């Protein structure tokens, strides 16, 4: 096997060209086998095997800098840079990340995880290179999907004035060369992607400039060339911005890719190389359903079926069913996603109500203001979005939604710890940034049924900005007997005793139950409260608890700073209530990838860690009482 020769960086450069295609096939088999066991991003990685190999063959890494937009397609890059043996621990706690990480390898030039950032980061590296008078290539690889994000165009606009080399590889995995551009552009691509073309171009220009009126002749030729390209060539938009364009190029032809990369190095300025790849290439199940294999858990290689541990509905499933049910009755309900209809559960809505479904692409900022506009026009927009991606639209929430009191519902999926995708995807900041905004209401359900009730409340019984945050994974079906009607700003008493009160937000109620069970065995009196509303905090409930309890324990799966616990402390401080409060929350840090149970333990928000903290604080409360006697 040729793959056995690839054990350290640059081993690929020792291969002969006749070995390239076999290595690509072996890498695909390796990825399918490994990801079938660990889970991960499969379809996108199968699509860029040859592209990645060509980049490593054409450039001198790590001196040359390679940036992967989003970064989920960097698995082949990791294989070629000496990390092949780490794939058994892919995305596991303490194991290899599923994204580029500078602290994992110096071949990873820039950390990524969210979309549309690579051109900005690459341009920054170019400027650093030039100001330090250094000499290396900078290559940003960005997918066609990421080009739906406005940040990419902001960076392209900035890059258009560059006078030094910057290479942008556009990985287009949704189009076919023949279907979209035909034979003439393909022929012109072959011509434009050759050294002889650029030699001729430079020689003709230099000769003409020496002639009387040469400047005028060159300008005329450029205008004629531009008009011709406008009619028959793709990429005209980029060239209108002042960015050179090469392609389209077959992204599965390694030698042709290498040739184009060498041409691109010669261009003084920013250059786009349009590469066409096939998502899921080489594995029939991923080719047929690339969306399913974009991010997938362990699966059966033969059938392509995911090995799910349970068929119970997820929170996303619960949301999907309820919004469709409500939309049947209320035609003003519309749904918005930022390129995540599958993940957020809006696929069913898109089929049932296609005229009321809007996928705006990877454009969270636009999605929020677009939703605000629909709300201003009398509709009831629901923006379904992952917690970590909503961060990108903070200003739009504040400026375009909340200042105007517009009725936009934010359905925030993947709130809290999400696990294997790591720092960039943990949903642990939404409570902090949302509760800082005036006019925003924030709720968190204790189980799947309460999520349904909250969505109905938000759409039918409310008329201002409101967010519902819920976790990834299977919807909790316990505590169904506690189903008091939802009233604005009011918490729900679950179990009322005395001494110690556990006030839990959302899915932390499950942990609160486990903590109470253990503490009851030790003889403690424990109250459990379902916060329901993170903002506003139920101050009546807090007053009630302070009358019969000595210790209030807040519990949330969010960072402490700016979260639910701090709001509770602030209320007691404002009312001069000196009751002891213990905040259980995530630390002021980023949380790496790994199993959620492990991450909770490491972060101190699991059952045993909380019990230890509660007992220590309770001992302090009793000691304080003794000192005051």
Please report, for each region that a protein language model flagged, where it lies by residue.
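Peripheral docking tails and interdomain loops at the edges
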Residues: 298-301, 306-311, 419-421, 441, ...
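Glycine-/acidic-rich phosphate or pyrophosphate-binding loops and their flanking alpha/beta elements
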Residues: 259-262, 294-295, 304, 314-329, ...
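Non-catalytic terminal/interface segments that mediate subunit docking, oligomerization
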Residues: 65, 277-390, 396-406, 487, ...
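N-terminal amphipathic, basic-rich helices that act as targeting or association modules
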Residues: 1-80, 237-258, 274-277
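Cofactor-binding active-site loop characterized by glycine-rich and histidine/acidic residues
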Residues: 41-162, 315, 333, 337-338, ...
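Structural signature of the thiamine diphosphate
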Residues: 217-285, 407-412, 432-481, 607-629
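Long, well-ordered, tryptophan-enriched scaffold segments
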Residues: 174-319
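A glycine-rich helix N-cap at a beta->alpha junction
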Residues: 86-96, 161-173, 196-199, 402-414
